[in-house]
């Protein structure tokens, strides 16, 4: 599970913590440089779906195409949705989720209700985060800035350096870091994989 779009997270945080409408929170995100003039890819879940496709390749060895990923954005949420969720003890976050069983992987992006105590529910502002679950360690959370000029420029420069020094060709697939790579995994709807 992860919050893979800092713009959407900023908007949802502003709506929850300051009672802003969706339109007002989006306008503020644009003013601060977190959202593009056309924010469609951020708010409809497309950007998160693209990032989830990359993560699925790394984690499961599955070459998912973003259009194969079920998605729903935050652009239909309003202040009442946020308020009702809060009254019930929940926070709404746009989550990218991946599950797998022995033969299939399910990939999904949608607004999700998380209990206020959930680690991902506590990620605020223009931050991204990924929660990873391990048998021994339990839940671990990795988070950092996810929108704006600084984080974007930093990522681009890091990618250019990787290309310049030849690190970009060392992919997880080439290194065969997972045992199930290339064994016929299919991408299925979430309800078929997740129990």
Region spans (language model):
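Oxidoreductase and adenylate-handling cofactor-binding alpha/beta cores
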Residues: 8-20, 50-64, 159
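Catalytic-loop motifs flanking and including active-site residues across diverse enzymes
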Residues: 48, 152-155
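An anion-binding loop in the catalytic cleft
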Residues: 132-139, 157
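Glycine-rich phosphate/pyrophosphate-binding beta-alpha loops
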Residues: 138-150
């Amino acid at each position: 599970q992860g919050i893979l779009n800092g713009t959407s997270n900023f908007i949802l945080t502003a709506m929850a913590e300051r009672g802003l409408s969706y339109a007002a929170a989006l306008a503020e995100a644009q003013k601060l440089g977190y959202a593009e003039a056309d924010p469609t890819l951020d708010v409809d879940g497309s950007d998160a779906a693209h990032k989830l496709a990359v993560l699925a390749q790394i984690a499961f060895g599955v070459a998912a195409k973003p259009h194969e990923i079920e998605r729903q954005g935050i652009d239909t949420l309003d202040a009442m949705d946020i308020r009702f969720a809060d009254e019930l003890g929940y926070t709404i976050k746009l989550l990218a989720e991946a599950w797998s069983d022995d033969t299939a992987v399910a990939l999904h992006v949608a607004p999700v209700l998380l209990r206020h105590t959930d680690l991902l529910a506590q990620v605020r502002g223009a931050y991204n985060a990924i929660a990873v679950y391990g048998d021994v360690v339990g839940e671990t959370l990795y988070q950092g800035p996810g929108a704006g000029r600084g984080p974007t420029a930093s990522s681009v420069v890091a990618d250019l350096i990787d290309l310049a020094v030849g690190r970009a060709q060392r992919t997880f697939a080439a290194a065969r870091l997972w045992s199930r790579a290339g064994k016929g995994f299919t991408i299925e709807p979430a309800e078929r994989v997740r129990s």
